[in-house]
Amino acid sequence: FSVDYVNNKYASNIYGALQVDRKVVEVNADVKINEGMENFTIAHELGHIVLHVPKMDKNKMTECDFDSISKDNVVEKEADIFAACLLMPESNVKEAFYQIRNSRLLLKDNFIFRLIGRGSKRKRALNFASKIIKQGNFKVSKYAMINRLIGLGLIKGLRYQKNNVNSRV
């Protein structure tokens, strides 16, 4: 498989797609994403190649729309988990985390925090994720790191975060 950057093909909410018949991962060049999101997009599509392409009907291998294959998005979640584990190995994340903190981070919605300018749980999580990314030299988005920290049980009190390109944080 190779990686191609394509214009004028996908909607702005599609970062990447897999062209199975051509053995190409396509990245939507029309969407301005940072390096971390680009890395995650490519790793996500690689997850589909490893986890899902071997199970596909060989006679129907064209553009792969995994969203339509799975109504409950299990396939997409599996590709996300694959990408997270590939780009942010558990041992590396924990090492970076424990160099900054000695215990799990419990985020509470606290009126006092908002008064003194420390912001919402989401904002505090984004700031903390930025520190972990820098400490561990990870090349991922803040949202990807937050979700990995949640998945590893290192952040409590926050649900998985959906990345939104249009909200520049």
Name the predicted role of every residue range.
Residues 1-169:
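Active-site hotspot residues in diverse enzymes, especially metal/ion-binding acidic/histidine motifs
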